[in-house]
Amino acid sequence: MPPKKTKTSTAVAREATESPMAERSRAPDALQADPPAPTQESNNELVDSRSLEEILSGIPPPPPPAMTNEAGAPRLMITHIVNQNFKSYAGERILGPFHKRFSCIIGPNGSGKSNVIDSMLFVFGYRAQKIRSKKLSVLIHNSDEHKDVQSCTVEVHFQKIIDKEGDDFEVIPNSNFYVSRTAYKDNSSVYHISGKKATFKDVGLLLRSHGIDLDHNRFLILQGEVEQIAMMKPKGQTEHDEGMLEYLEDIIGSERLKEPIQILCRRVELLNEQRGEKLNRVKMVEKEKDALEGEKNKAIEFLTVENETFKKKNQLCQYYIHDLQKRSRDKEAQKEKIQEDTKDISEKSNTLLETMKEKNKALKDVEKQLNKITKFIEENREKFTQLDLQDVDTREKLKHSKSKVKKLQKQLQKDKEKVDELKNVPANSQKIIAEETNKKDLLEKQKEKEEEKLKNVMDSLKKETQGLQEEKEVKEKELMEISKTVNEARSKMDVAQSELDIYLSRHNSALSQLNKAKEALNTASATLKERRAAIKELETKLPKDEGDLKKREKELESLVSEEGNIKNQVRELRQKVEEARSSLSANRSRGKVLDALIQQKKSGKIPGIFGRLGDLGAIDEKYDVAISSSCGALDHIVVDTIDTAQECVNFLKKQNVGVATFIGLDKMKVWEKGLNKIQTPENIPRLFDMVKVKDEQIKPAFYFALRDTIVANNLDQATRVAFQKDKRWRVVTLQGQIIEQSGTMTGGGGKVMKGRMGSSVMVEISDDQLQKMENKLKTDTTRATEIQDRKAHLEEEVAKLRQATREMKNTFEKYTASLQSLSEQEVHLKAQVKELEVNVAAAAPDKNQQKQMEKNLETLKKEYEKVAEKAGKVEAEVKRLHKLIVDINNHKLKAQQDKLDKVTKEIDECASAITKAQVSIKTADRNLKKSEEAVARTEKEIVANDKSIEELTEDLKKLEEKATTVMNECKEAECSLPEVQEQHRSLLQEIKAIQEKEHALQKEALNIRLNIEQIDSHIAEHQSKIKYWQKEITKISLHKIEDIPEEVLPGLAQEELEAIKDPDQIINQIALLEAKSHEMKPNLGAIAEYKKKEELYLQRVAELDEITNERDSFRRAYEDLRKQRLNEFMAGFNIITNKLKENYQMLTLGGDAELELVDSLDPFSEGIMFSVRPPKKSWKKIFNLSGGEKTLSSLALVFALHHYKPTPLYFMDEIDAALDFKNVSIVAFYIYEQTKNAQFIIISLRNNMFEIADRLIGIYKTHNTTKSVATNPKIIAAKGLAEMQSVGCA
C-alpha cells in the first residue's frame, strides 16, 4: 500500500514526534511521519524488476470500514478522562463521565476548557507545540500550591457499546481499556495500555483498529481550524503536498493503486524502448541475410554439379565390383576341387585329436590322484602340528600342577598352626569357669541367708511345703555332685580323641607326599633323557636337509628365470611369425603393378625399388582420414633414382602390366630444408610431422607429397587458421575437408576416404625367412615344455624339504627350551624325595601306644554316657519339686521371694557364664576338629594334584602315540607318491609323441595349403580390389543441399551392370563434370553463413514477439488498474458530494454546495474544487466566502465524510465561534442528529449549542487549579419543570 503523505495542519495532518530518551526506553511522543515518496527523476532511475503477477499480487484490497451506520452495531466511546498534574489540573482530576452521544464542555475563558482537548492530543501522541507548549516538561502543572511536580499523566478510558433506546446502552463485556501517557521533567514520555507499558506504535495500532482516524484526523477540529478542510487546494502542488484530491483519495482508499500504476507505467515505457531496439536488430539481420543470397545460390549450383559427378563415379565403381566378383567366383570353384583331397589328412588328424583327448583325460585323473595324495600328506602334517601344540599345552599344565604342590604345603602348615592355637582355648575357658564358680559360691551363701529370711516368713506355711522343700534340697545336693562328675568325664573323653587323631595324622600325610614325589621324579628323568637324544639326532640331520633345500631352491630359481625368458622369446617370436604371415599374405594380395615391380626387386633385376609410399610410413589412426583425403601421392612408388624409375616404366610397358607414378629420392634433396619443424597458427600439428618412417631417407618423399599441410579439428578451426595476414595455409580437417591455399574447399560429405596408410610400417619378408622363424619357434616351444616339467618336479621336492625342515626346527627349538626346566625339576624332585623319606621315618607311629590310646578313648566314652544319663534324671526331679513349691507360696511370699529371685538370677548368670565357658571349650573342640578337617582337605588336595600330574603324564604319552600314528600314515602316503608321479611323467611323454605325429600331418597338409594359398592370393587380389572399389564407393557421398530433398546414391541391378559394355564412356562423362566444377570456384561457406544469418533472423524475430507480448500484458494491466482506480474513486466521490449537497442544504436552509472535478475527463490530473452557493447568492469558490459560510461548508464536508466513512469519536473546539445564533442552532440540532452512531465532545460558549447537549462538563478555576463538574441538563430541566408545576399547583 502506498505510504501516507505528510499533513500540513492539525485538522488534516500530523507532525513528527519528539524523540524519546534512550535511558528510559520510552515510546515516541507522536506518530512518525512516513518517508516521502521518491521524486519523478528518481522513479525513472529505479525500475521495479518484479514480474506482473508479483506486482498485482502486492496490491492490498480496499480497506474495510472500522464501523458502520447500521443500528445495533458496536462502537467505541470515551467514558472519562483522568488528568494528573496536567497543565492547569493539579493533582488527579476526573473529567466526565461523557455521554454516549453529545457532550459539551463549557466554562469561562481561561478556565482550562481547551486543556481537555490538549489532554486527549497528548495521549494520542501529538508534539508539545500542538498542545500549545514548547516542550513536554511545560505540560507538568506548576503553581504556588504545587511546585516541583516531576511528571504529569493523562488517562483516556474507552469502552465498546451497543446503542439502545434513549440514553441507554449495553457495554460489550471485556471491551474496557484505557490509554495513558506520562511526561517527565526531562521531556521524555512513556505510554501504557491498560497499565501495561507500550510503544506509541502499539497505541496507534490499537486506536486505528477501533476506527479512530489518526491518519486524517477527521475526528479532531481545533479552535479556528474548522474552515481549513474546505480551504485545501484542488490538488497537491508537489509530491509531498496534499490537496483535496489526495485527502479524498486517502479516505476512499483508491490511493493504494497509485504506486502500482506508476510502476506499470514506467515498465511499459521501458519495454517500448527495448522493443524498439529489438525491431532495429531484426531489420539489420534481415538486410545481412538478403545480401548473402546470391553467393549461396552459386554454391548450391556447384554442389549440384558435384553430386552428378559422384553419381557417375558410383556407377563406375559398381561396375568394377561386379566384374571382380565374377572372377573371384571362378577361383572359388577351383579351390573347392582341391580341398576335397584334404579329407584323408583331416580324418587322421581327427583320430589323433581323439587319442589326445583320452590321454589328456587320463592325465587329469592321475593329476587328481597326485593332488589327493599331496593333500593327504599336508593334512597329516597339519594334524601332527596340532598334536604338537597339544603336547606343549599339556606340559604347561603339568608344570602348573607341580608348582601347585608348594602352595598346598604352605596352606597345610597354616592349618596346623591354627590347630595348635585352638588347643589353648580350653585352659583359658577353665580359668573363667573358676572365677565364675567362686562368685557363684558367694551368691549361694547370700541365697542361703535370703532363704533363711524366707523360711521365717514361711513358718506358718511350713506344714504345707516342708516335705517338698526337704526333698528338693536333697535332690539339688545330689545334682551338684553329679554335674561335676559329668564335666570331668566329658573333658577327659575329648582330650583322648584329639590326642589319637594328632598322633596318627602326621605319618599318613608324610607317606602320601613321598609316593607322589617319587612318581614325578621318574617322569621328569625319562622325559629329559628322551629329549637329549632327540636334540643330538636333530643337530646332525637338520644341517644336511637345509643344504639339500638350498641347492634345489637355487636350481628352481634358475629354472623360473629361464622359463620367463623362454616364454617371452616364444611370445615375441610367435607374434613376429603371425606378422610375417600377415605381411606375406598382404604382399600376395597387392595390385598387379606393385607386385610385378616387387618381384623384380627380389630377383635383383631392379634393386632400387623401395615400395609404395603409403606402405613406407605409418600414422596414428586419428589422422587416417586426413592423410587419405589430402595426400594423393600415397599410391606412388618410391625408387632410389630417376634412372631406376625409367627402368620400371620400361618394364611395365614391355610386360603390358599397367602404369604407375614414381618418386626418385635423388630428386627429393631439394625438399630437405622443409623437414624441420615450423611454427603453425594456433600450434596445430603439421601432417608431415605425424608420419613415422623406419628409413629416414624416405622422409623427403613424404614432405614432397604433403608439404606444409596442417590438420585442424573441425571446419571452423580450419577456416579460422587457413587465411592469415602474412600467409595462406593448406588445411585438412580430421573429417577429410580440405581448404586449398587458393581458398577453394573440397571433401567432406557423408562418406570419407580412409585406409590408404596403416598405423605400422609394412615389412617385406620371404617364404624362406618365414620357414626359419617357424623352426625357431618350434625349438623354443619344446624347450619351454621341458623346463616346465622339471620345474614342477622341483617344486614338489622343495615343498617337502621345506615342510620337513620347518618341523625339525620347531622340534629342536622346543626341546632345547625345555631342557633347563626339566633338569631343574629333576634336581628339585630328588631333594624332595630324600626329605620326605626322613619325614616318613620320623612320623611312623608306635603300634602298642596306638592300641592303648584307642582302648582308653573307648573306656572314657562309656563312663561319660553313664554319668550324663544319671544327672539328667536328677535335674528333671529338682525342676518338678521347685515348680510345686512356687505354685503354693507364690501369692504369700512375693516381696521376700523377689529378693531371693534376684539372688537366684545372679546365680543363674554366673551359671550361664560358666556354661558359656564350657561351651567355649566345646566350641574350641569343634573348631579344632574343623581345622583338623581343613588339614585333611589340604592333604586330599595335594593328593588330587598328584593325581592330576599323573593324568597329564598319561595324556602326554597318548599324544605321542597319536603323533606316531599320524607320521606313519604320512610316510606311507609319501611312499606311494613316486609311483603316481611316474604315471604322470609317462602320460606327458605319450602326449608329446602324439603331438609330434600331429606336427607331421600338419607338414603334409602344408603343401596342399600352399597350393590353396596361391588360389587364395588371386582371390585375395580380387577381394582387395573389390574392397578398394567398395571403399571408393564409401568415400562417395552426395552433398546435402538446403531446401532440396536429400538424394541417395542408387544401387544398380544385375541387368544394368551387365548392360555396361564400355566403362570409358562413364570416365569421359566424369571428366567433363569435374572440369565444369573446377571452373566454378564457389564460396561454399556462403551456405553456412546464410543459414546462420537466417537462424539469427528467426531468433531476433522470436525475441521481438516475446518482448511485444510482455509489453502488451503490462499495458493491459496498466489500463485495467487506471480504470479500477477511477471507478473506485468516482464511486466514493459521488457518495461524498451527494451527501455534501444534502448536508449543506439542510445547514443553510436552501443553499447548495458540491465537489466538482476540475478536469471532468481525468479527476487525477487537476484535482477537486469545492464550490458553494450560499442561500440567495450565486455560486462561489470556497476562498471567496465569509467566515461563517466557510465554517458551514467545512462542517457539511466533515459530516459527509462521516457518512461515507464513520468514525466513532469527534472532538470540536468552538466550531460555532464564527456563526450567528440562528446557524448555531441549526448546527447544534444537526450534530445532535448525527450523534446517533457517534460520540461528539464539543467545547462551546454558545448557549444555542450546549443547551441541546446530553451532558455538560463544567470547567472552572480556583486557586490556580482547574476543576470540573458533570451535569445532565435534560434531567435538571425536567426536575425544574416538575418543581415549577408543583409550585404552580400549590
Curated annotation (Swiss-Prot):
Its main location: nucleus. ATP binds at G107, P108, N109, G110, S111, G112, K113, S114. SMART domains: SMC_hinge (SM00968). Gene3D superfamilies: 1.20.1060.20, 3.30.70.1620, P-loop containing nucleotide triphosphate hydrolases (3.40.50.300). GO terms for biological process: cell division; mitotic chromosome condensation. The keyword Ligase does not apply. One of its GO terms (molecular function) is ATP binding. Residues 15-27 have a biased composition (Basic and acidic residues). The keyword Nucleotide-binding applies. One of its GO terms (cellular component) is cytosol. Forms a heterodimer with XCAP-E/SMC2. Component of the condensin complex, which contains the XCAP-E/SMC2 and XCAP-C/SMC4 heterodimer, and three non SMC subunits that probably regulate the complex: XCAP-H/BRRN1, XCAP-D2/CNAP1 and XCAP-G/CAPG. Belongs to the SMC family. SMC4 subfamily. This is Structural maintenance of chromosomes protein 4. It comes from Xenopus laevis. The lineage of its organism: Eukaryota, Metazoa, Chordata, Craniata, Vertebrata.
